[in-house]
């Protein structure tokens, strides 16, 4: 698993706006389509995955939607943006840089050997992560991992 922080200008610009609402932007997929004959203008389509330690509710998604649409319109130079905002759920972690966002959450990691471990994410940096399983911390270098996935606890 590689560690490569997302440094694209559009991602950073949107992440800053999302942080102002107390959330983290985990992933942003963004595209601008060609000019449509019907509407005679280009349109943007985006999907944002956000995280908040207190949970991502419908209200949080709506607030992020309202604040992100104008930013995406400006970045894409389009008047119309179709934006979908959602929580990470049981997200497969695609990049080791995402681990720092999910500190304190339960994750399942798979090793190159085919074995796996479930634990609470206690620490993450550029080279390794630390899971706490049964009160015992285990440090795991990213090079030993093939896959990782969130296992969110059910919140009442």
Swiss-Prot record:
Family (UniProt):
Belongs to the RimP family.
Q: Which UniProt keywords are given for this protein, alphabetically ordered?
A: Cytoplasm, Ribosome biogenesis
The terms describing its cellular component in GO are: cytoplasm
Q: Which InterPro entries match?
A: Ribosome_maturation_RimP, RimP_C, RimP_N, RimP_N_sf
GO biological process per UniProt:
ribosomal small subunit biogenesis
Q: Major location, coarse class?
A: cytoplasm
What this chain does, per the record? Answer: Required for maturation of 30S ribosomal subunits.
What is the annotated localization of this protein? Cytoplasm
Output the HAMAP family linked to this UniProt entry: RimP (MF_01077)
Tell me what this protein is called. Answer: Ribosome maturation factor RimP
Transmembrane ranges, per UniProt, are none
